[in-house]
Structure formats: C-alpha cells, structure tokens
Amino acid sequence: MSNKRETFQSALWRGDFGNDYIGRNPASAANVQAAAMLWAQILLRMKGAPPRSILEVGANVGINLVALRALSGAELFAVEPNDQARRGLAEASIVPQANLLDGVASSIRLADRSIDLVFTRGVLIHIHPDDLLASCREMHRVAKRYIVSIEYFSANAEELTYRNQANALFKRDFGAFWLDNFPDLRVLDYGFAWQRLTGLDNLTWWAFEKSG
C-alpha cells in the first residue's frame, strides 16, 4: 500500500477548486440516469461473474455510486479527497461510513485484491503523468477481478487548461496505458458515450479483467 503523498493536483481537489466542481456536478436525477445507462452497458460485460464489491476512486458526490446501487447488489466503497464531497456521501448514505475513505488514487487504504471492481470516471485525467503509474498500480493492487476507466481520450498525451487552471487536466489513451503497464489485464470491451445522445461528456470507457 502506497504512502499518502499530497500533490499539486490532489491539493486542488481538496480545496475550493474541488468544492466548485461539486456545485457544477450535483447528483441530480438526470445525471444519475445518464450514468445508469452507461453502467448498464458496462455491467453487461460482467454478467457471467457480476462484481459483489465495487470501489469508485474519486467518487465526488456519488453520481456513479447511486446509479450502481440501482443496478447492482454489490457492496459499495468510495475513495474521495474532498471533505465536502465525503460529507455529502455520508449524509446521503450512498456508501456505508466504514467504506468511505479519505484518500487519492495513489494511496488506497484497502487490502490487496479486496474489491471485485475498481473504477474511475473523470479522475485519471486529473492526475499528473508523473503520478499516473503509481495511481494505476494502487487500483490494480486493490482490484480482485475488474478495472474500469471512464475518461477523456486523446491518441497523444496532452495537457489542457481546465477551468482556467493549468496543470490540472491531462488526456491520453488510458486504455493503452493500462495494457502497456499491466500485462495481466485483458479487454472485456470499450466504448464511447457521445454527449449528443447520452448527456455524458464525450467519454471513452475501457473495461478490463485481471487474468491472475
């Protein structure tokens, strides 16, 4: 298990920058429904062995977890660095208090292979490239069977200004990054959520299964 290390990016999300994000992205019925439609597609790829435990790394206010609670009987876990977001998750009883962890992707206080499905949505894009491998290693360590990443895609690694903030958004082919660094992963499927039809922000998703 990695030692907790604050980075420029994690400090952003713990502070006002992260609080502002919460205000822009509530767990509204429309947002939850859009997430549920996407997750219904992804979970279909796991129907032969559905996950009994699910961890979201960077859960924020729990849009995905609310959707997953309606779709799955799995026990839910969340890692989230922002205090305000964690309070919201606790007050709404989206995950049990014991399963709600203060942390970041590079430091997950859970045992090896303890969670069937570990995922991110719009989180890897906010991790500096120098810290990305350590973060993915932690997710891989904790995942027992499945890893899912739902992120912005770019064929080439690039940094973009995000909400007038430099050093906060990094796009790449995250699917290739997973496969290049973790040879025990196999692709279950991948897809694209087109904003025009789904209401989601042109997201690419990859679903992997561990072979070991």
Cite the ranges covered by each PLM segment.
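Class I (Rossmann-like) S-adenosyl-L-methionine-dependent methyltransferase catalytic domain
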Residues: 1-109, 130-134, 141, 145-212
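A conserved beta-strand element that flanks and buttresses the S-adenosyl-L-methionine
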Residues: 119
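Nucleotide-sugar donor-binding/catalytic module of glycosyltransferases
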Residues: 122
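A short His-aromatic
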Residues: 125-127
